[in-house]
């Protein structure tokens, strides 16, 4: 499976690294990559195409341990070159909702969002859903 499509290339142009700073859990998800044989999920929110054709990507990297998962950088070439059992490769999630934010992507993947990110997200969600009587 090709990890980067023309559609993803356009999204990386729209969301270069740094473009969603400060949004935390509300950052728009561009892509989700995963290890089909076990742990390893990368939920990508930003990325830059490098001169050599590789992509530097930023997002939530979860390697099977909620306590050790973190926002960070990963290179496309690193994901493409991971040696998995049975000759399998890292795959792109074809069924991730298109207009999904980071918290929604974590929840649909079964990842527990970190408390610092979830608290801010839920506060904003509650403020967005408040009924005002005038």
Which residue stretches match the model-derived regions?
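Acidic, aromatic-enriched beta-alpha/helix-loop junctions
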Residues: 44-83
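Extracellular structured ligand-interaction cores
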Residues: 28, 39, 56
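Hydrophobic/aromatic-rich, well-ordered segments within soluble, folded domains that form packed cores
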Residues: 31-51
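N-terminal domain-onset segments
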Residues: 1-36, 133
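Helix-rich interaction surfaces within compact, conserved domain-sized segments
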Residues: 67-121
